[in-house]
């Protein structure tokens, strides 16, 4: 279980309130698919993923990215119970979708990069440390149902 200090929680909540979920979600998933192309195999139904520009402009990538980041909002609301908050998604990704749990770590790291680019100087090392802790906790929670 991940333990967050009051300061870390405050830092995460403060920044999360400023995140444009639609924009950041689409960008995060798009970058994941570009930087780690083997992750594209889970998105065969998304159409054209042949180039970085095709991926970043793909409406299905943007829509699913928004969905992913919206569900990530559950982590922000449930920092003290990440495993519980992501139990159903963990089961889905393990039993039905067969997603390699390493991909959760990759997406979390891409999310941190997106936040850094969107918030610039506001994304201090302390802010990054809090967010890195959160995305790591989410990745662990999502991998929980894997055998």
UniProtKB/Swiss-Prot annotation:
It holds the Pfam family Globin. Red blood cells. InterPro entries: Globin, Globin-like_sf, Globin/Proto, Hemoglobin_b, Hemoglobin_oxygen_transport. The keyword Phosphoprotein applies. Keywords: Heme, Iron, Metal-binding, Oxygen transport, Phosphoprotein, Transport. The modification Phosphoserine is found at residues 14, 51. Gene3D superfamilies: Globins (1.10.490.10). One of its GO terms (molecular function) is hemoglobin alpha binding. Residues 3-147 form the Globin domain. It comes from the Eukaryota. CDD domains: Hb-beta-like. The keyword Metal-binding applies. One of its GO terms (cellular component) is blood microparticle. SUPFAM superfamilies: Globin-like (SSF46458). Heme b binds at residues 64, 93. GO terms for biological process: hydrogen peroxide catabolic process. Belongs to the globin family. The epsilon chain is a beta-type chain of early mammalian embryonic hemoglobin. Heterotetramer of two alpha chains and two epsilon chains in early embryonic hemoglobin Gower-2; two zeta chains and two epsilon chains in early embryonic hemoglobin Gower-1. This is Hemoglobin subunit epsilon.
